[in-house]
């Protein structure tokens, strides 16, 4: 099963899309010099206005990893996209020579804006999320585990998409899922398995698949977390409970960006926030066979686990 998360390698051919320079993402009003493949902002107010501009960014010399904090700014460098500086609600983009629009928009939406929100006190987890009835469900797992594919399966089953690629958790009250934007990053095998190819747009290895008709625009309580794993011997999907220790380890392991946590020296805060999620949400392990034709059954397994 293919997982449609942000990859640091460029796609084989440029993805064509009509980008907008004023959009809403993560409940933020985003004004961007880099066109983003989202619906244009149509009025109303976002929680905060974020401005993305192109300019010169010098990653701090001597810094380890792909994130650094210096003089109140947060720096990111992302292969095949560029170097980014976050100053409060301002983002400066220094695109690399090899950056294609697909890679740059994927980096901004999947890595940079979540890092900005992390710097403002939100928890960021790598994964996808959906609303099933009134329940908010997070799907976490390693790269290629099939998180986006399952999110697409849940969308196809009539459930609302909350986030893909990066899960942002707010702690005003109990943990809640912050809606990201009405797009899923899907590859052709998943689209074909769910008969969604006609709605995907121009062909390439991956698409920003529109889910405007099935997007949840308001925060949803984070009630369940599924740790998705492939089981080569499994004939059908299954769910298993996990210990509190295993739940905590899974949440820590799938942090949105370990480099950002380390660069900002917020390990203790990150640990406390993961502990709050582990305590508040029902965490289970979800096993899936390596068979895209079972996506509908995988979605039903999630539904049944919530009953």
Language-model regions, residue ranges each:
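Long, basic/Gly/Ser/Thr-rich N-terminal segments
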Residues: 1-100, 300-307
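Glycine-rich, often acidic-flanked micro-motifs
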Residues: 2-33, 39, 128, 132-142, ...
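Residue-level signal for well-ordered alpha-helical segments
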Residues: 7, 61-63, 68-70, 89, ...
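Extreme N-terminal, non-catalytic leader segments
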Residues: 77-135
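Conserved glycine(s) of the Walker
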Residues: 146-147
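Post-Walker A alpha-helix
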Residues: 150-151
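Aromatic pocket-lining residues of Rossmann-like dinucleotide-binding sites
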Residues: 154
